[in-house]
């Protein structure tokens, strides 16, 4: 009979098979009440599942992330329970857990409105408040199929027919009269599922295939308690205020239109930000000793077949033809950089060779996934490729890591989560090469004192990689930076250098991106700063305003001085009240407003005010220039006197 070993090493002996819930009760009534599921020998199981052999067991509660994910999954079933009561003809497809919540794809004969979602949310709460038990039954494949055929659940039948072996025993979960199928685990009782909210609905193809029927995807969020739910909803509210699409329109940064889906029309102020960001990256490239190159934006399909992109990536590539040749518009820069490397004989003495490009790339992203600057079809990559020897890998990765943190710190990003993806089952290269490559990446992170977690088997077939995910002020995660080793592409494209023993050697290639897509990074910055860009990035850094016409000439004189000092300045001589002008430029997030009245003209000075409403008093224009230049030159995140 089972001996159960708990996480603290203590053991409990039973003379009969026991469930996870039985073990929780044996430990104490408080734990039994909190028990959502269990981890038995490392595998998540339902609280009702029986254990009939010795095992290590951990009780899962809502304090564990796994517990929160389980209650979110059960909220998806709760959604199914409610929607079948409101609209019995609904056909249920799939309902997985996602970040912060869940969704369910449903086949419904009408398009859900906001009122429908509110009604559905209300019914879900009414059902959850009954605190009913969720009953799990393991049945044969045929029993499961018969149950869903009887309910006319054609999508569940399709899942059984296409994805589940006839030898399996699927888990059926009974929510009163509602039946769902899942691997589980799920909550034992709906008292765990009180803190949720439905958010929105959208279209989604069955199995993600546009040839299949369009279903409706209903999204919801769920949390362990009311406090966590409210905090999340507040973050969403703040995120909506910071939406880069809204701010981009308000500040006249860019627009997008149907004639060019996923392509950005940069307006003057948005393009100013883009060019400033590009200049910053270019400065760092020089500091870290990169060459800057420029490759063609399209190349013959034959080349993309050699690289393997055509075989694995063709659905995401735009193509065109001319004179009986087919060309691919590049989705990435790496093959072009190998072509540049291949020009002229290279020696081991020429390595490492660091090659960077602001490459104009295009990817045929699904139209439904496009989202402002965050998900586009045309974008500029700030990536680079380093050609080096195996012995140089660690030093080069070290340099890449330092560059990543150097650049992110400029924007105030401090929380950066790092993951190291290691060898997948299908890969090229010997185990010795992979051992060394993974060791070099891990050692470089350790040498820089950077904590990281492994992602076993998540590396590309051609090499391991490091991923850098930055967290913004709302703790949202943005995966931007990567350092990826590549043992494949240089050989596929016949790249080589002459080694120390006069032999031809294929170089190791390191793919390195820091910002990723320039467009996306500007979107991230827009939301991070809520449009209050640091002065060095702001499209207009100062605006000079008159109070009456008598100061117009003085305003123009000051504007020219500021412009000559390298400050982006505008003069506002409109016949409007000064309060109106200040409000307008404050809404435009202009860092500094310089006001000129008769007193300022007489003293040869200017009244300085920040966009946050702080009055900095009267200064000479030379002092203003000196202080602004210092703030801009240092790329400070803070304004004067902050």
From Swiss-Prot:
Q: Which reaction does it catalyse?
A: tRNA(Thr) + L-threonine + ATP = L-threonyl-tRNA(Thr) + AMP + diphosphate + H(+)
Q: Which GO terms describe its molecular function?
A: ATP binding; metal ion binding; threonine-tRNA ligase activity; tRNA binding
Q: Mention any Pfam family matching this sequence.
A: HGTP_anticodon
Q: Which cofactor does it need?
A: Zn(2+)
Q: For Zn(2+), which residues are the binding ones?
A: 334, 385, 511
- Outline the segment boundaries, as ranges, of region: Catalytic: 243-534
User: Any idea of its EC number?
Assistant: 6.1.1.3
Q: Check the record and name the Gene3D superfamilies matching this protein.
A: 3.10.20.30, 3.30.54.20, Anticodon-binding domain, Bira Bifunctional Protein, Domain 2, Threonyl-trna Synthetase, Chain A, domain 2
What processes does the entry annotate via GO biological process terms?
Answer: threonyl-tRNA aminoacylation
An annotated GO cellular component of this protein is:
cytosol
Question: Which leading EC class covers this enzyme?
Answer: ligase
Query: Boundaries of each TGS domain copy?
Result: 1-61
Q: Which compartments is it annotated to reside in?
A: Cytoplasm
Q: Which UniProt keywords apply?
A: Aminoacyl-tRNA synthetase, ATP-binding, Cytoplasm, Ligase, Metal-binding, Nucleotide-binding, Protein biosynthesis, RNA-binding, tRNA-binding, Zinc
Q: Which InterPro entries match?
A: aa-tRNA-synt_IIb (IPR002314), aa-tRNA-synth_II (IPR006195), aa-tRNA-synth_II/BPL/LPL (IPR045864), Anticodon-bd (IPR004154), Anticodon-bd_dom_sf (IPR036621), Beta-grasp_dom_sf (IPR012675), TGS (IPR004095), TGS-like (IPR012676)
What does the Swiss-Prot or TrEMBL cofactor note state?
Binds 1 zinc ion per subunit.
Q: Which NCBIfam families match?
A: thrS
Q: Its function?
A: Catalyzes the attachment of threonine to tRNA(Thr) in a two-step reaction: L-threonine is first activated by ATP to form Thr-AMP and then transferred to the acceptor end of tRNA(Thr). Also edits incorrectly charged L-seryl-tRNA(Thr).
Q: Quaternary arrangement and interactors, per the entry?
A: Homodimer.
Q: Which family does it belong to?
A: Belongs to the class-II aminoacyl-tRNA synthetase family.
Classification via PANTHER family? THREONINE--TRNA LIGASE, CHLOROPLASTIC_MITOCHONDRIAL 2, THREONINE-TRNA LIGASE
Q: What is this protein called?
A: Threonine--tRNA ligase
- Organism name: Edwardsiella ictaluri (strain 93-146)
Q: What is the lineage of its organism?
A: Bacteria, Pseudomonadati, Pseudomonadota, Gammaproteobacteria, Enterobacterales
